[in-house]
């Protein structure tokens, strides 16, 4: 897994090209998937028709992006527990290094996991991290074209942390 420092600069519009192939949890045909496996510490997963496209929300009178980065694992079979570990690692990194003046940071409380394909060939397990849960009505990102190549989202699922982090540093007062 890459370090959080190496991935902080990734934005949702980045286009990644990888050559290693993962088998994921897809079956023989394109888009045929088994149900998403459970992950310790997360609620029962929701199988999705596409990846989440989360809007900005209002927080403290400002637009706030709940998206909190991504990870791509392309040397392992599909395993959403890798995404869970990445989510937890991102929260820890943000808590230690990215606390604002109000004592707030962006916790990872939700992730989507899916297989990204290029022209039907699996590239790897993609993990998109978020500060809050989004329901399946936001699962509208089915992929994109880049030149002549078609990148598709298959076997998507979402996972919400069973004990969400508030994203606030609490100070202990010693008396």
Identify the function of each model-found stretch.
Residues 1-9, 103-139:
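Disulfide-stabilized extracellular beta-strand modules
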Residues 94-103, 116-120, 143-147:
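Low-complexity, polar-biased intrinsically disordered regions enriched in Pro/Ser/Thr/Gly
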Residues 1-109, 155-175:
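Conserved small-residue hotspots that stabilize compact domain segments
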Residues 131-170:
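Extracellular juxtamembrane "stalk/stem" segments on the ectodomain side of transmembrane proteins
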